[in-house]
Amino acid sequence: MMSDYNWFEGIPFPAISYQREILEDIRNKFVVKEEDLLILTYPKSGTNWLNEIVCLIQTKGDPKWIQTVPIWDRSPWIETEIGYSAIINKEGPRLITSHLPIHLFSKSFFSSKAKAIYLMRNPRDILVSGYFFWGNTNLVKNPGSLGTYFEWFLQGNVLFGSWFEHVRGWLSMREWDNFLVLYYEDMKKDTKGTIKKICDFLGKNLGPDELDLVLKYSSFQAMKENNMSNYSLIKEDRVTNGLKLMRKGTTGDWKNHFTVAQAEAFDKVFQEKMAGFPPGMFPWE
């Protein structure tokens, strides 16, 4: 399994589109501008949904931008070759997406006033979503079974490393004024409330009609039908059975896939790894 990844500082990256030199540059040389907005997530946490919402907030609900420009051009992934190149050459405020753990992120961010949104999701759902997603790509070795992927996930031998370490790292910034923590589960339960929370954080005033447009065009169905957001433009050589980026978009799907023993094993690891956080920090627990 080890040879199927690009390893950097103990973190596994996909074997293509990720280079050691770029990852080093991001951490040590890349300068985050004060007007930049960062979308930070662990994979399969709802990154693209959050991106779509943020893009629509920027345009006050006008869908033209999201329907004409691919999502990876609107908010490039800084850790990819193409994304990094696009970001460093972009003038003005930048929307930047990243799955990087905190210790690999740009050092300049931590002394800047740039705003960042960190989106979290129940790691059990992330595990199941990741299993079905990565199995359809040629980016990593196919685990072959959920049981195998389950073990890899708990060990942190999956893309971008351990969920537990990723979350512990970024949550160390949760008290900072320029850092907003969101939960996928809250976004599903009260999407409009979450949109308002993001607007408040960004200092954007949207009227009721504009909020409704953001809600409408960021819906699961709207994104599924938008070729600029559903990743249908990805080259076929990267995927085996078509890239099912948007499989279900639900919460609690893990209950349909975990055995009782797996559920108990996961609970045990979660309690050990996430000890010390205040009660209520994780709404799914």
Swiss-Prot record:
Its main location: cytoplasm. It catalyses: an alcohol + 3'-phosphoadenylyl sulfate = an alkyl sulfate + adenosine 3',5'-bisphosphate + H(+). GO terms for molecular function: alcohol sulfotransferase activity; bile-salt sulfotransferase activity. It is found in: Cytoplasm. Keywords: Cytoplasm, Lipid metabolism, Steroid metabolism, Transferase. InterPro entries: P-loop_NTPase, Sulfotransferase_dom. The active site is at H99 (proton acceptor). Its EC number is 2.8.2.2. 3'-phosphoadenylyl sulfate binds at K44, S45, G46, T47, N48, W49, R121, S129, Y184, S218, M223, R247, K248, G249. Belongs to the sulfotransferase 1 family. This is Sulfotransferase 2A2. It comes from Mus musculus (Mouse).
